[in-house]
Each structure stands twice: as structure tokens, then as C-alpha cells.
Amino acid sequence: MAPKYDFDKVIDRRDTNSFKYDALDEMYGRNDLISLWVADMDFATPDFVVEALRERLDHPIFGYTKPYDSYWQSIVDWTYRRHAWAVEREWLCYIPGIVKGIAMALHAFTQKGDKVIIQPPVYHPFRLVTENLGRVCVENPLRCDDGIHYRMDFEQLESIIDEQCKVIILANPHNPIGIVWSREDLQRLAHIAAKHNLIVLSDEIHCDMALYGNRHTPFAAVSDEARRCSVTFAAPSKTFNIAGIVSSYAIVPDAHLREHFFSWAEAAELSAPTLFAMVATEAAFTQGDEWREQMLCYVEQNIDFVADYMAQHHPEIRVIKPQASFLVWIDFSALGLQHDALVDFMVNRAHLAMNDGAMFGRQGEQFMRMNVGLPRAMLHKALQQLTEAISTL
């Protein structure tokens, strides 16, 4: 019988150099906030990952370690088991983090001054890393015609593409909105990319966290066009709560793109997986199915808890339930506060640390991104604090 994992247990993360907790004063000006911001979870890393690390720690030398076959095979097997995508070993390359992988790809495939397309509101490092590298961000904003449902604007996308556009950065599933893109949408995006000779960098770090019966579709698996024009980035870090162990990887099916990307990564000495990344990844991907199922069930219940609470106490506030992951996009425009006042209200009156929606693009100025990957008692307390603060408006 499978073990029953305890996601209700409250674990004190303060004074562990946790960015989510120990950077509150630096980021928000006070440290008495409930942390609902940084995208890691407050659930214990699963025991089988901890045990695998502990077993390796029993050997007292942590010297240079060569990548081993069972590590790579665990990625291949997991990807096929979870997503029916038959990845080949030679397509895989370790990367020291998803954002760093995107930076590596921009170095490999673009020059300064080239244009990179993003789809805001979207994960803010897409813009930051692009501009920091001297490339130009071009926006293809998502459309939201009813205040709830977002979609890609393919017509606007085609209108902004010119010969300087080289790359589209895709969040698949989307962050912060949690969209699980349909196969048809991804095929259409791939066709546009192929037509205009664009490379799609697909950030799929939330791919193993599809919710409510939704199924993630890997971008590169939807068509030959997608396979030939894409680099996919993934990791076990979100799903198994091991973000501090940098365990990301790239999947590059096309031989031409693979040669360019891998040669750049190898020349920069960035393609060798670290010892503990290999240990943690293999443990997660070979033993993690049941833990993942239970964790996702708990996250779904937390999302429903937030949606039901808001519907009962604050029906004017729109909760956009994600189709994937533990991040909830919430529209607070009904509170009638301007952007700066909304941010101040959340921090200094509700005493909540959420991500300011404006960081994902100007389209998010009246939104907050709430992390619900925490014990339900703490989530309930956060919602109660929000209610108390709203009562003072």
C-alpha cells in the first residue's frame, strides 16, 4: 500500500537562508508576512529524494563526478511515462537552471540587437535575461476577452514578426496564469515559427504539474515543424520541491540546433550535471509517481479552497484557476486601488507577500500571483488576513 504523505505539516523555513522567507525584509520592507510569492512549495521534499541524497552523503568524498547512464535514462523514462514523448538520450543536455538555459540559447542562436518575442503577462526573467544580453524584447500579449480565459493572439504575432525576430520564448504551461496549451495552439505556433525561421525556447518547468485532468503537451512533440525549431527546458525542481538543487536539462531533437546549443554549452563548461542534481533527479523520476499524485491532489484542493473562499467572502475578486502548477493569478481590480496602493495594501495591511502582477508585464498591474503550495492552515490564515484588511477599505 502506498504511503500517505502529510502536506498539512507546517515546517518553519526561517533562518535557513530561504529566499522565500529570509529575504522578506529586503524585498518587502518587513518580515512579518505570510510568504505566498517565490515559486517553491512549503511541503517537505519527498523522503525518497532525501534518502538518496543521504545515502550519497555517507561517502565522505564529493569529488568530480562523471555523468552516469541511469541519470539520463531516468529523464528519458519519466518523459515517456508522463508525456508519451519518446526522447532520445543524445537529445539531452544538463543546464544550470532554466533561465540560464534560456540565456545559453540566446547566446547560441542570436546576436545583440536581435528581437526576441515574449507573451505577457509572463514569467519576468524572460524579459530580464533578453534585455540584459542586449537583445530586444517584442511583446505578443495574451488576449483575455472575458476577464478569465487567456489565449494566444496569433494575428498580432504574425504582424510583429520581421527579419530581426529570431526567437519566441514560450511558457508551457504558462506562468503566471497556469494555462495548459492545447496541441492545436502549439501546432499553430510551430507553423508560424517555421514559416518565419524562428526558434522556440519552450520553458516546461511546470510540465509535471498539470491539474484537474488536464494533460501537458510538450511543444516539440506536436509536429515535425515543432521538433525542428525548438529547444525545450525542464526540471524536477518545481514538482519535487528541490529548486535549491539545480537539476535542469534541455531537450533538443533537431541535430542542427543541437550542434549549436551543445557546442556553446560545452565551450562555456556549463553542460556537466552536478553530483547532487543527478542523485536527486534520478530518485525523483524513478520513485516519485505516487508522491506527485498526492501532492497534485492537495494543490488542487488548495486552489479550490481559495476559489471557494473568494466566491463566498469577496465575489468581486476574480480567481483564475490554473490548469497547471501551484500558482494562482488573481484579479484585484475590484478593490479600486491603483497599482502602487494595491501593492502597499497587500504588504502593510493584509501582511501578505505575493508577487506583484506588474512584474509579469503591464497587463498584470491589478493582479497578484499567489503561491498555494503550502499547508492549508497557513493558506486559510492568509485569506483571513486578506478579509480583515479588505474590511478596512
Per-segment meaning from a language model:
Residues E158-S159, A226, Q338, F345-M354, ...:
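PLP-dependent enzyme catalytic core of the Aspartate aminotransferase-like
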